[in-house]
Amino acid sequence: MKICGITREDDALLAVAMGADAVGFVFAPSKRQIAPSIARDIVRRLPPEILTVGVFRDEAPSRVIDIVNTAGLRAAQLHGHESAETSRLIRARVPLVIKAFPAGDPELDRVDDYGADAVLIDSPRPGSGEVFDWSLAEGRPDGRRVILAGGLTPGNVADAIRQVGPWGVDVASGVESDRGEPGQKDARRVKAFVEAARGALPPRAPRPVDDLDGFGPYDWMEDDAR
């Protein structure tokens, strides 16, 4: 499961401590937008097994590639109207690509063209935090790693997992504090979300990121030696 919209180091460490598999940093214009330099500093504090994801929306491929690699991220999440050609170009230059689509998007029928490692299905208004009809995500795209997003909370994530059976789930606003700065996470909500999601998994289910072992984290020692 991915805790997205991380803006503070404390929240990233909180997510990891509570059992999250991944954390996301938003580089697209948003109230949760973070500077690449700050994201890089946070990433360097995280365990290497954590999947670190940069979220972009219709950004120039060269900038996506530069931020992912210089910040030491393991994945680029393309959350806009990126073409299949753009997705493949970026995938050739970063460790992993997650391509996001609105629920019901006909492009889900040709998702193989995008060359993405995982597909994220969001509400028809991506990033709005709105819940959508989960039946739109059932069984599609077949045989792909599907990440479910859109209005998930500690109160509904278990039902979503049982109905859709996704490879992963993604949350941002559903675990945020009612007070504080934009993007600030609430420890109790993060804990409740992770516990609810884990509780909905079948016994002995592997952690979703376990099948990404071939895609290692950024090698900081190699980078520093250049």
Explain the meaning of each model-derived region.
Residues 1-226:
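Conserved N-terminal beta1-alpha1 strand-loop-helix module at the mouth
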